[in-house]
Structures are given as structure tokens and as C-alpha cells.
UniProtKB/Swiss-Prot annotation:
Name listed for the protein in its UniProt record: Hemoglobin subunit delta
Pfam families: Globin (PF00042)
SUPFAM superfamilies in UniProt: Globin-like (SSF46458)
In-chain residues carrying the UniProt-annotated modification Phosphoserine: 51
Alphabetic keyword roster: Heme, Iron, Metal-binding, Oxygen transport, Phosphoprotein, Transport
Tissues expressing this chain: Red blood cells.
UniProt cross-references to CDD domains, sorted A to Z: Hb-beta-like
Similarity-based family: Belongs to the globin family.
CC per GO annotation: blood microparticle; haptoglobin-hemoglobin complex; hemoglobin complex
InterPro entries in alphabetical order: Globin (IPR000971), Globin-like_sf (IPR009050), Globin/Proto (IPR012292), Hemoglobin_b (IPR002337), Hemoglobin_oxygen_transport (IPR050056)
Length: 147
């Protein structure tokens, strides 16, 4: 559960309506793989990840990033029950993929960077604070099955 004020909820949902899920998702995942290269081990089957350019232009990275961000967007509809909304993904990442749950926080950080880059002045400090709460809540929900 994420505790947002009415103003924070309005900021999050209002800005989300402007998000290009395909573009931002690929960029967020690509940044994760470049900035934290040890995360690439989960995506070795994506092909060439040998350089920042290769990662950022890799169609499989872009497609998976879009899928990840679409799931994040679906989660925004369930801010009062993020653990329930992400239960299946939490189990998948824990039991099958064995992803370090810390990586969910790192991806959230990358998403905040991407939102700031694309939304510019609209991504105010207040909007960032609200999104920081949301990405922390999503990361916590995704890590739920690890406990």
C-alpha cells in the first residue's frame, strides 16, 4: 500500500497519462542494464549487451522494458493493494528468475530519472516525491514473495 495525499495521487495519475510506455520503458530498462551492468545476467538471452549503445538499441531490451512499464502502469490502478497487484510477478521473479529484490529499487530509480528527463519542468519536486513513494511501494510489493 502506498499512502499518497489527494494532491500526490493527482500528480502521479496526471503525469502517467503523458508517459510513452514503449519509449520510457525501454529507456528505463536500458539504463538499468548500463548503469548496473551486473543486472545483465538476467537478460543474457537478449543478445548483444556489450556496450551502452548496444543495450539502448537492443529491440528485446526495448520490448521487455515496455512490458515492465505497462505492468507498472497497471499497478497504479491498485495503489491500495500493490502486493496483490504484483503477487504473480513477485512469485515469478523470486521462484523462477531469482532476481535480487534490490534490483526492483534500482529500476525504480531509473524510472524516476527517465520521467524527469522526458517530463522536464512538469516533473516537479512534488511529483518526484510522489513517484518516489510509488516506486518504493512497487519495489516492496515485488519483493514480497522473498520474505
Amino acid at each position: 500500500m502506498v499512502h499518497l495525499t489527494a494532491d500526490e495521487t493527482a500528480l502521479v495519475t496526471g503525469l502517467w497519462a503523458k508517459v510513452n510506455v514503449k519509449e520510457y520503458g525501454g529507456e528505463a530498462l536500458g539504463r538499468l542494464l548500463v548503469v548496473y551492468p551486473w543486472t545483465q545476467r538476467f537478460f543474457e538471452h537478449f543478445g548483444d549487451l556489450s556496450s551502452a549503445s548496444a543495450v539502448m538499441h537492443n529491440p528485446k531490451v526495448k520490448a521487455h522494458g515496455e512490458k515492465v512499464l505497462a505492468s507498472f502502469g497497471d499497478g497504479l490502478k491498485h495503489l491500495d493493494d500493490l502486493k496483490g497487484a504484483f503477487a504473480e510477478l513477485s512469485a515469478l521473479h523470486c521462484e523462477k528468475s531469482h532476481v535480487d529484490p534490490q534490483n526492483f529499487k534500482l529500476l525504480g530509480n531509473m524510472l524516476v530519472c527517465v520521467l524527469s528527463r522526458h517530463l522536464g519542468k512538469e516533473f516537479s519536486p512534488q511529483a518526484q516525491a510522489a513517484y518516489e513513494k510509488v516506486v518504493a511501494g512497487v519495489a516492496n510489493a515485488l519483493a514480497h514473495k522473498y520474505h
